[in-house]
Amino acid sequence: MLDSHQPKQTQRVALVVQYLGTHFHGWQRQKQHRTVQEEIETAIAKILGHHVTLHGAGRTDSGVHAAAQVAHFDATGLIPAHKWASVINSYLPKDILIKASAAVGDRWHARFSAAYRRYRYTIYTEDRPNLFVTPFSWHYYYAPLDESLMQAALKPLMGKHHLAAFHRAGSKRSHSWVEVQAVECHRSGPFIHIEIQADGFLYGMVRLLVGMLVQVGSGQRTLANFTELWKEQRREEVKHAAPSQGLCLLRVGYPDFPFTPDVWYDTMPKLVFSQESLVNSH
């Protein structure tokens, strides 16, 4: 704990946060549930001697992972902003890591200053399960998936659209407009990766969308039907969300991002989902 008699200076500190979502009930603090926000706030409180509020760029659901979530808090004390990462890490459990910390201006906000969020969903398509990838993917082996059809279904989503069909109940958001900036679906060995970048995401949007894409890729639903469904906002037909463990928040982008590019996720998925290692293990 910091010495309360030291001169206090207030600074806003931004964090890049990585976490394994398996044993968390999401990002946002909740009573009687373990959450990422609560764990980090508790760690900071032990350092400062009082509670601070941590603001995240996105509220990931229960079981969802993050390679580079971004958050900020206001601190009083003499700890330099760039040292906060290592200080907080010494108080955190092993399934959360602060990758970097930096000073930002008092008007910078992890959520409201963000230009985009990018998510990746991973599907594992081999018949046999693999315990090393199960925590990070949806093991879908019920029917072959055509990733080219899934990519074709994604393309019309580019741009600004009313995506109420992929909006779970329980959200406080007053509208369902989303500007989709990038979409991609590609196969890497036994894995299909779906990436979506947008200015913001509706509650449950990616998992509902992936659930429908799998229906397209498996031939259960046509491309035309999929497009009509979301354009006509037929939410009642979107019944199955993809499992949470396959989803990962990859990055959050800002016009004035205060970190160097090495905090990004780029090498992480290659280590977790290495095609060569899986092939060689057979």
Swiss-Prot record:
Catalytic activity, reaction form: uridine(38/39/40) in tRNA = pseudouridine(38/39/40) in tRNA
Record-listed E.C. numbers: 5.4.99.12
InterPro entries in UniProt: PsdUridine_synth_cat_dom_sf (IPR020103), PsdUridine_synth_TruA (IPR001406), PsdUridine_synth_TruA_a/b_dom (IPR020097), PsdUridine_synth_TruA_C (IPR020095), TruA/RsuA/RluB/E/F_N (IPR020094)
Sample GO molecular function, one term: tRNA pseudouridine(38-40) synthase activity
GO biological process, one term: tRNA pseudouridine synthesis
Enzyme class: isomerase
Keywords: Isomerase, tRNA processing
Pfam families named in the record: PseudoU_synth_1
Residues binding substrate: Y119
Residues at the catalytic site: D61
Family: Belongs to the tRNA pseudouridine synthase TruA family.
PANTHER family recorded: PSEUDOURIDYLATE SYNTHASE (PTHR11142), TRNA PSEUDOURIDINE SYNTHASE-LIKE 1 (PTHR11142:SF0)
NCBIfam families: hisT_truA
Role played: Formation of pseudouridine at positions 38, 39 and 40 in the anticodon stem and loop of transfer RNAs.
Complex formation: Homodimer.
Name of this chain's protein: tRNA pseudouridine synthase A
Organism: Nostoc sp. (strain PCC 7120 / SAG 25.82 / UTEX 2576)
